[in-house]
Design a protein with these regions (language model features):
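Generic structural signal for short, solvent-exposed loop/turn connectors between secondary structure elements
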Residues: 1, 72-73, 77, 87-98, ...
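A broad, low-specificity signal marking well-ordered, structured residues that form hydrophobic/aromatic
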Residues: 1-3, 14, 99, 122, ...
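Non-heme Fe(II)/2-oxoglutarate
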Residues: 1-93
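Short beta-strand-to-loop capping motifs
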Residues: 18, 126, 183-187
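Positively charged, low-complexity intrinsically disordered regions
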Residues: 56-57, 114, 183-185
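Catalytic core of non-heme Fe(II) oxygenases with the double-stranded beta-helix
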Residues: 94-162
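Catalytic core of Fe(II)/2-oxoglutarate
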Residues: 136-203
Length: 203
């Protein structure tokens, strides 16, 4: 099975080497958010959708930054985030919930799944230094009964990584505390983003 590292591209991902970002700047940005901003995933989701169903597999080891608890601003409102967003040519502007900081405690893992809400994500790993465990893509259409592993990809820590959410994927148990800034959208398909990349019109 193929394992991709560094600057790479394959069927379900592409490292966007046209974008360079300052990981230390994002680390400092993340570190300003105190414990009151670190909400368990299920609690975070209800801030924006009170009827959001409880997901048992998304334990309290998986938290998201609820930025308004710090000073009333959403993540998307901060200049450091806007500077990143401006580097991409999305089909439509991102919304408030399309910018996320994800924080995972050691021992958390993602079972095989698809992203129900979005088509693509652009991942900026903040911690640990090596970017953490790889993303694994799986064959099949039923995430409850996936087929064979297709390949694994380690997120680049130099350039953001574009991934599709519509292919079954998982992440093995995390050994270290992990933090990722994620831009996501349901209004730009993976193929549209790749086509724009190929024409030099996405970044």
């Amino acid at each position: 099975m193929k394992i991709y590292t560094g600057t790479s591209s394959a069927e379900h991902h592409r490292v966007l080497d046209g974008v360079v970002w300052d990981r230390n700047e994002l680390l400092e940005f993340y570190q300003q958010f105190d414990e009151s901003c670190h909400l368990p995933w299920n609690e975070f989701k209800k801030k924006y959708n009170p009827n959001n169903p409880y997901r048992r597999t998304l334990t309290d080891k998986f938290r998201q930054i609820y930025a308004p608890n710090l000073e009333g601003r959403e993540l998307i409102d901060y200049p450091v985030v806007q500077n990143l967003i401006r580097q991409f040519n999305f089909d439509e502007p991102l919304g408030v919930t399309d910018v996320q900081i994800l924080a995972y405690e050691p021992g958390f893992s993602f079972v095989p799944h698809i992203d129900a809400e979005v088509d693509i994500s652009i991942m900026f790993p903040i911690a640990p230094d090596d970017g953490g465990e790889p993303l694994t893509f799986w064959e099949g259409d039923d995430f409850r009964n996936p087929g064979e592993m297709i390949y694994k990809v380690h997120y680049s820590t130099e350039h953001p990584t574009l991934v599709t959410g519509k292919t079954i994927h998982s992440v093995e148990e995390m050994k270290d505390y992990r933090v990722i800034l994620r831009l996501r959208t349901a209004k730009t398909s993976f193929q549209s983003a790749i086509d724009k990349c190929n024409s030099g019109n996405f970044v």
